[in-house]
Amino acid sequence: MANILILNGASRKNGNTAAIIKAFSEGAVSAGNQVREFYLQTMNIHGCLGCEGCSRAGKGTDDPCVQKDDMSEINKAFMSADVVVFASPLYFWTISGPLMTAADRLYAQLRSLGYSKFPRKSVLLMTAGGSDYSQAVRWYETFERNLGWTNLGEVLGAGKAKEAERLGASIK
């Protein structure tokens, strides 16, 4: 069983991204996994200050960031997550602003732990009316590679609920 953390960067709570997350989650739960989703659009998460306060926090601290906003809750869930799912509609050929902000803020947690010493598995779920996901996929693959994470799969495009469900069910 895996603990799966979903960072939902969609602006529409019941849009295409929500549909693909729902299918993925149903598959994951059917395989015995636990899923926790954060809908970032309604959360109060500020951008990274670049102050390096996190570098002075103790290793493995639940929340090493000096900013105390809703990211604190995500940081705590991140510590016990085996799989991190980045879910977003395609905005201006990349991931949404809320998802980028949350991903940037993971810096505090990863900085205090030592980047490559906190291996995770990850998934990318994206939807769009268009089809050019290349910039978003490059961001995701760079993020993973630099952290030493393992890509479990990508589902790119609306209307791919079955594919998302199969991916979720494949996680053990």
Walk through the language-model features, giving the residues of each:
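N-terminal beta1-alpha1-beta2 submodule of the flavodoxin-like/Rossmannoid cofactor-binding fold
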Residues: 1-87, 93-108, 112, 152, ...
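Short glycine-rich anion-binding loops that position phosphate/pyrophosphate groups of nucleotides
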Residues: 90-92, 129-130
